[in-house]
């Protein structure tokens, strides 16, 4: 899109051009490579880091678009700072993300969809784990792009593990990691148990995941779940389940869209390190689901500055 804007700017200058960046490619890359983006923000040179991280082509197009379009915008104050430092161009205006409010069901339809979502989530968990789940279990989730550190997936797993081992849990908890990965196929054993309503009495093989992956041995989520010592045994108060498919209603296991899953949650957690805005916590709040975000997310910073308490 940036290249298109540059082409129009040169060939048809009578047409006004606008470029909105929802992140900077070099900022995302710095954060994803375990470098301290925010602690040393004022010391980074975008061109130098692009060369170091092999991001020169993408960074160059992005930078030229920022400098030469008629109007350059971004979605949050934290990303505006990033643009100024790494692209050498402050946005002309910050336009916070948002969406129309009418995509959330209301009244009886909301209650119906929430009940259906909880029933589906708990049923899949029971088939996978081979044990009963309390109908009133606390269902919590995280979701987003598979950026293990940037999206705080590692922090989410660690937080769930601390809760699991705290010895203070009174209520059963099922934590879902709804992050698309390199899926090979929906699990045939789990799919059969769901479709034929087979009551499983023992956990399925690798009872942490709903779909098989191409790269199971190298998957960071599965490896950290195992490293942390999760067992998903019936005796454990907290279970964790990785849902690595796109939730488009055709995944083969849940067969529900993301929103039709989100509505069944009791809480969501998005502990992002790099999050220019953060649709996920905003969507969660829109659905009436309490959420945790961070003060490094654009939405988190906006909420902290703009609204608080009951006004949120």
Task: Name these PLM-found stretches.
Residues 1-312:
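Catalytic cores of nucleotide-sugar-dependent glycosyltransferases that transfer UDP/GDP/TDP-activated
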